[in-house]
């Protein structure tokens, strides 16, 4: 990520999360300062053109997950979006945010950005990557089933969630649903699913497993 990308990233954020305040230049600069190699940008250039534009981003930081609780919110895990809790000794890569411009969705960019983050896990010999998956399909059925029942149905394929199903197809595993992960997510009825991808070369020992 470069400072010249900041305006495009803020624009993508405004389009992907219209109810949220876009990232500021100061916040993006802080991310880049704390963990530069963990801020991944995907660019797109039309055929025959050298004028590439930002098409998607994946923001990550390293955490010592034993210092946190699995029910912690996005604000807690990102230190209110400052990434000041990035820990070079951390064994977990936390996927704080992944966004793809609506102009480039369904082109495989989210998968490519996830693969780039997994490469960071492998290259730095981290134990795993952890994230919080929105459950935008849950709000419509929350009155008749619990979040646990909904996530179980999505895992077995009997129900489809626009976000969690895509994560499962991309190799993530569900740990469990949690409440209050994001401040403003009415489509998910305030719920999210903790998901993880374990490094097959150095998986976490039993005392570091998430439950």
Where are these regions (language model features)?
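Hydrophobic adenine-recognition pocket in adenosine-nucleotide-binding enzymes
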Residues: 1, 98-100
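A short beta-loop-alpha structural element at the N-terminal edge
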Residues: 1-9
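C-terminal/domain-terminus segments
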Residues: 2, 112-120, 124, 175-211
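Hydrophobic pocket/interface hotspot
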Residues: 9, 13, 167
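Active-site rim helix/loop that mediates acceptor-substrate recognition in acyltransferases
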Residues: 16-67, 72, 78-84
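Short amphipathic alpha-helices and their capping/turn segments at secondary-structure boundaries
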Residues: 44-46, 81-85, 114-126
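Conserved acyl-donor/pantetheine-binding loop and adjacent beta-alpha core of acyl/acetyltransferases
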Residues: 58-97, 115, 135-162, 168, ...
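Conserved acetyl-CoA-binding loop-helix of GNAT-fold acetyltransferases
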Residues: 100, 106-123, 129-131
